[in-house]
Curated annotation (Swiss-Prot):
The modification 5-hydroxylysine is found at K92, K256, K323, K533, K644, K811, K869, K881. Residues 303-312 have a biased composition (Gly residues). This is Collagen alpha-1(I) chain. Expressed in bones. Residues 26-44, 106-122, 139-157, 205-244, 341-367, 376-395, 454-463, 566-580, 593-620, 649-665, 710-725, 851-865, 899-932 have a biased composition (Low complexity). It comes from Acratocnus sp. (strain SLP-2019). The modification Phosphoserine is found at S98, S569. Transmembrane segments: none annotated. Pfam families: Collagen. Contains mostly 4-hydroxyproline. Proline residues at the third position of the tripeptide repeating unit (G-X-Y) are hydroxylated in some or all of the chains. Contains 3-hydroxyproline at a few sites. This modification occurs on the first proline residue in the sequence motif Gly-Pro-Hyp, where Hyp is 4-hydroxyproline.
Length: 965
């Protein structure tokens, strides 16, 4: 056969249907196969088209307001506002200038001057024997001058004398020591921080207008831009009032205001006590003959202290006329009318009583000579230089607190201005209305009470309005889809970001990213309303003292202060001019009886005689025997007064007379109105003690010359020696009482002297921190005149030399007549040194010795101890609450946050739970402080501290002249 060649395989047939299960049992399941290797991932399919944008989710519910976060730490304190300037205290009404002494009136015509004999040494009093019929003995030789009697007791101050005419203002006084500040008051609760204002330029110090009487308060000036004082703390307790601070430069002094009434001391001398009966006559002593009128006595005690005048050069004495013929001495005529009353000087400390010497036998009067023609009146001399400065006195003790004065006028409140750029602070506005002060109760000011309990805490302020949204940030680039991250911890919600505008198509939902950092804090909201005022905190540290603002207008005059006790006596002033004759005193005891004579007819006034030339000193004659006592004669009629005689040459000074009796105590005078303040004056230098002059020998009286015509006034001649005593003439008949002469012309006023420096201040309480004094503001209009203050104590300024008295009128002739009643005692002289208290002699009127020379001015007494510190004044009223500052301006919006990068779109997760409220953002910058509130009114003035103890008495002044016979 043939070879079979296989053909190609045919196609396989269709798969057969499964056969029926075999009859055999089912096999066991085989072990699991090993896992196959994972297949490699297929290629990524193409990215599907983006799905439609999802709908914006509904706005979530507004979160409930979170609990207010804990109060953050206080923000940095803004610059401390300058301390509110306390309402300037009303300028103290400066004590009016002491009214300069009015021009001293010319002394009234002196009553006929008794002829002073040289006092003999005091002998033991003898019994007055009956006057025998023997002839009159010749005058004995002048005995040596008696020892100076101890100073008499100082008369108590009489009622004030009439107010002298206002003098020109004094020169500036010395700058007083700067008063120490009172204790620091507790700091009030701090108000909103004020914008610190630049200190305004000080206003130029205007020239002070004329002071005059204080006018009504002027209209308050327009309120300047408020500076930046913080709210003033509650006023501290006023410290003890310090001495006046240094006076700022003041304009030229205005014209003098009304002169205040002179305070005590001063006043007319009290009536002379009734002279006791004459003591028994002593044994015949060294009593000289009664000579012609001796030299003029020393000037009377100084008048009320005026402004020190310049010491005048003495005017030239007139040329002596020819010697008059000797006349017989008559009995002293009645005292002339009193001249213009001099202002009373300060009383000195009483000296101890001196021994009273026994009276010598009285000489008999001679017949009066014929009167000469009146002489021409001399011209006033040039003013002298001021005297040395006296020692500083101690401060007087403070009196009780006075009733507070009426409240000042209410100033208009300023309008609330908008906060502008920082400008210079304007002048302080007028003080607000002050409540009336209740009357002061009796007793002294108590100590300040303990601090009160703290007040309630203020409620928290309301939440401020949120600031504006920031500008939207730019949209970020779309990121790739990331793998889902782990769910982060829920962080605090950040602040809402700005709402974007015109965002592009949303990216795919990214997986939640990690919580971003907290956003920047939003701007600070407006300040909430202030809570209730908390309790006053403890006093804070004293801030830096701000510049003192310009001085505001003076406030109304304060209530009068309590009258202080009299300070220590100042140094003795220079010898004042001779006082006018005093009022007629009580009638003295009857003198020794004279021979009875017929009543004389009224004599015609004789022509005035010129003063005689001084005779040569004669030898002293032996003492004559005592003359017999004559029977009392009738009192003659009053004779007509003769014309004034020419001024005689001055004789040597006589010895010091006995002290005058103490004057009666007068009621205190009314307080004077406070005058405008005077500028400070220069401090004078204290002069040294001058040598004490020796007492010259008593001259003997020469016979009077015949009357001559009055000559022209020439240059002053030297004092001639006293003439020898002439032989006594026979007893003249008692003439009629002369008519009282008219008072002389008033002398010219001296120039005002410089005021003395102010005394040292008393101790002051602890001082608060004080800043530098700012320049003084212009002087405001004068305030209304307050009630008159009590007279303060007199400062211890140096007393200037008195202005030169006008030339005295020509001396009248001695008129005949019965002995005049004793005149009132002269005003007490300055305090002399305390002499040793001698044994008290028997009382009896001693003979008036001739006036001695003025003693040298004693040195200034030692300064008294410093006064105790005054008590703390009562707490001032709390100032009204300052105006709340305006809400600060809203701070600027914070910068927009940097945009975050777009995260990959993730599947939208479920809404998470609402997060807790976020922590409070850090506080924004403080807004600008509002304008400060007005300054509260000043508290009431503290009471003046008690005065220190009285210093030791000053040095002795020159002795006063002897009283009238």
């Amino acid at each position: 056969g043939g070879i079979s060649v296989p053909g190609p395989m045919g196609p396989s047939g269709p798969r057969g249907l499964p056969g029926p299960p075999g009859p055999g049992p089912q096999g066991f399941q085989g072990p699991p196969g090993e896992p196959g290797e994972p297949g490699s991932s297929g290629p990524m399919g193409p990215r599907g088209p983006p799905g439609p944008p999802g709908k914006n989710g509904d706005d979530g519910e507004a979160g409930k307001p979170g609990r207010p976060g804990e109060r953050g730490p206080p923000g940095p304190q803004g610059a401390r506002g300058l301390p509110g300037t306390a309402g300037l205290p009303g300028m103290k009404g400066h004590r009016g200038f002491s009214g300069l002494d009015g021009a001293k009136g010319d002394a009234g015509p002196a009553g006929p001057k008794g002829e002073p004999g040289s006092p003999g040494e005091n002998g033991a009093p003898g019994q007055m024997g009956p006057r025998g019929p023997g002839e009159r003995g010749r005058p004995g030789a002048s005995g040596p001058a008696g020892a100076r009697g101890n100073d008499g007791a100082t008369g108590a101050a009489g009622p004030p004398g009439p107010t002298g005419p206002a003098g020109p203002p004094g020169f500036p006084g010395a700058v007083g020591a700067k008063g120490e500040a009172g204790p620091q008051g507790a700091r009030g609760s701090e108000g909103p921080q004020g914008v610190r204002g630049e200190p305004g330029p000080p206003g130029p110090a205007g020239a002070a207008g004329p002071a005059g009487n204080p006018g009504a308060d002027g209209q308050p000036g327009a309120k300047g831009a408020n500076g930046a004082p913080g709210i003033a703390g509650a006023p501290g307790f006023p410290g003890a009032r310090g001495p006046s601070g240094p006076q700022g430069p003041s304009g030229p002094p205005g014209p003098k205001g009304n002169s205040g009434e002179p305070g005590a001391p001063g006043g007319e001398p009290g009536p002379t006590g009734i002279q006791g009966p004459p003591g028994p006559a002593g044994e015949e002593g060294k009593r000289g003959a009664r000579g012609e009128p001796g030299p003029t006595g020393l000037p009377g005690p100084p008048g009320e202290r005026g402004g020190p005048g310049s010491r005048g050069f003495p005017g030239a004495d007139g040329v002596a006329g020819p010697k008059g013929s000797p006349g017989e001495a008559g009995r002293p005529g009645e005292a002339g009318l009193p001249g213009a009353k001099g202002l009373t000087g300060s009383p000195g400390s009483p000296g101890p009583d001196g021994k009273t010497g026994p009276p010598g036998p009285a000489g008999q009067d001679g017949r009066p000579g014929p009167p000469g023609p009146p002489g021409a009146r001399g011209q006033a001399g040039v003013m002298g230089f001021p005297g040395p400065k006296g020692a500083a006195g101690e401060p007087g003790k403070a009196g009780e607190r006075g009733v507070p004065g009426p409240p000042g006028a209410v100033g208009p409140a300023g309008k609330d201005g908008e906060a502008g750029a920082q400008g210079p602070p304007g002048p302080a506005g007028p003080a607000g209305e002050r409540g009336e002060q209740g009357p002061a109760g009796p007793g002294f000011q108590g100590l300040p009470g303990p601090a009160g309990p703290p007040g309630e805490a203020g409620k928290p302020g309301e939440q401020g309005v949120p600031g504006d949204l920031g500008a939207p940030g730019p949209s970020g680039a779309r990121g790739e889809r990331g793998f889902p991250g782990e769910r982060g911890v829920q962080g605090p919600p950040g602040p809402a970001g700005p709402r974007g505008s015109s965002q592009g198509a949303p990216g795919l939902q990214g997986m939640p990213g990690e919580r971003g950092a907290a956003g920047l804090p939003g701007p600070k909201g407006d300040r909430g309303d202030a809570g209730p005022k908390g309790a006053d905190g403890a006093p804070g540290k004293d801030g830096v003292r701000g510049l003192t603002g310009p001085i505001g207008p003076p406030g109304p005059a304060g209530a009068p202060g309590d009258k202080g006790e009299s300070g220590p006596s100042g140094p003795a002033g220079p010898t004042g001019a001779r006082g006018a004759p005093g009022d007629r005193g009580e009638p003295g005891p009857p003198g020794p009886a004279g021979f009875a004579g017929p009543p004389g007819a009224d004599g015609q006034p004789g022509a005035k005689g010129e003063p005689g030339d001084a005779g040569a000193k004669g030898d002293a004659g032996p003492p004559g025997p005592a003359g017999p006592t004559g029977a009392p004669g009738p009192i003659g009629n009053l004779g007509a007064p003769g014309p004034k005689g020419a001024r005689g040459s001055a004789g040597p000074p006589g010895a010091t007379g006995f002290p005058g009796a103490a004057g009666r105590v007068g009621p205190p005078g009314p307080s004077g109105n406070a005058g405008p303040p005077g500028p400070p004056g220069p401090v004078g230098k204290e002069g040294g003690k001058g040598p004490r002059g020796e007492t010259g020998p008593a001259g003997e009286v020469g016979p009077p010359g015949p009357p001559g015509p009055s000559g022209e006034k020439g240059s002053p001649g030297a004092d001639g020696p006293a003439g020898a005593p002439g032989t006594p003439g026979p007893q003249g008949i008692s003439g009629q009482r002369g008519v009282v002469g008219l008072p002389g012309q008033r002398g010219e006023r001296g120039f005002p002297g410089l005021p003395g420096p102010s005394g040292e201040p008393g101790k002051q309480g602890p001082s608060g921190s004080s800043g530098e004094r700012g320049p003084p503001g212009p002087m405001g209009p004068p305030g209304l005149a307050g009630p008159p203050g009590e007279s303060g104590r007199e400062g211890p300024g140096a007393e200037g030399s008195p202005g030169r008295d006008g030339s005295p009128g020509p001396k009248g002739d001695r008129g005949e007549g019965p002995p005049g009643a004793p005149g009132a005692p002269g005003a007490p002289g300055p305090v002399g040194p305390a002499g040793k208290s001698g044994d008290r002699g028997e009382t009896g009127p001693g003979p008036a010795g001739p006036a001695g020379p003025a003693g040298a001015r004693g040195p200034a007494g030692p300064q008294g101890p410093r006064g105790d510190k005054g008590e703390t004044g009562e707490q001032g009223d709390r100032g009204i609450k300052g105006h709340r500052g305006f809400s600060g301006l809203q701070g600027p919006a914070g910068p927009p946050g940097s945009p975050g990068e777009q995260g990959p779109s993730g599947a939208s997760g479920p809404a998470g739970p609402r997060g807790p409220p976020g922590s409070a953002g850090s506080p924004g910058k403080d807004g600008l402080n509002g304008l400060p509130g007005p300054i509260g009114p000043p508290g009431p003035r503290g009471r003046t501290g008690d005065a220190g103890p009285v210093g030791p008495p000053g040095p002795p002044g020159p002795p006063g002249p002897p009283g009238p016979p």
